Amino acid sequence: MIQQESRLVVADNSGAKEALCIRVLGGTRKRYATVGDVIVVAIKSVIPASDVKKGAVSKAIIVRTKKEIRRPDGSYIRFDDNACVLLNAGGDIRGSRIFGPVARELRATNMKIVSLAPEVL
């Protein structure tokens, strides 16, 4: 469950390391975001000489959350961190690699993230 002011790890090679959620998209009263939701983030830390600049505002999709996700078969899955992947203006992912596992729930909407991920849980 990601809300405003939540800090997330950026799980791609776009150049950003950490992002801060500044808005959850999807309605006027939507407070929390989970895996597969799109949020607006501010970049808080970057690696040197990257295309992404500190303080830049971008859209991102959530790929991992610490809060467990209930699956239709009754099982739950949770991760060790909150992570996102940055999106460009067209809605495509900004980087060319994904780091760490991603949730299977992304298959319904984002096949590109699932195909680039090293592990899908």
UniProtKB/Swiss-Prot annotation:
The reply to whether rRNA-binding figures as a keyword in the UniProt entry is yes
Q: Which GO terms describe its molecular function?
A: large ribosomal subunit rRNA binding; structural constituent of ribosome
PROSITE patterns (alphabetical): RIBOSOMAL_L14 (PS00049)
Q: Name one GO biological process term.
A: translation
Top-rank lineage group of the source organism: Bacteria
InterPro entries assigned? Ribosomal_uL14, Ribosomal_uL14_bac-type, Ribosomal_uL14_CS, Ribosomal_uL14_sf
Q: Extract one GO cellular component term from the record.
A: cytosolic large ribosomal subunit
SMART domains tied to this protein: Ribosomal_L14
Task: List all disulphide bridges recorded for this chain.
Answer: none
Query: What's in the keyword line of the UniProt record?
Result: Ribonucleoprotein, Ribosomal protein, RNA-binding, rRNA-binding
Self-association state and partner proteins as the record states: Part of the 50S ribosomal subunit. Forms a cluster with proteins L3 and L19. In the 70S ribosome, L14 and L19 interact and together make contacts with the 16S rRNA in bridges B5 and B8.
Name the family: Belongs to the universal ribosomal protein uL14 family.
- Role of this protein: Binds to 23S rRNA. Forms part of two intersubunit bridges in the 70S ribosome.
Q: Which HAMAP family match?
A: Ribosomal_uL14 (MF_01367)
User: What name has this protein been given in UniProt?
Assistant: Large ribosomal subunit protein uL14
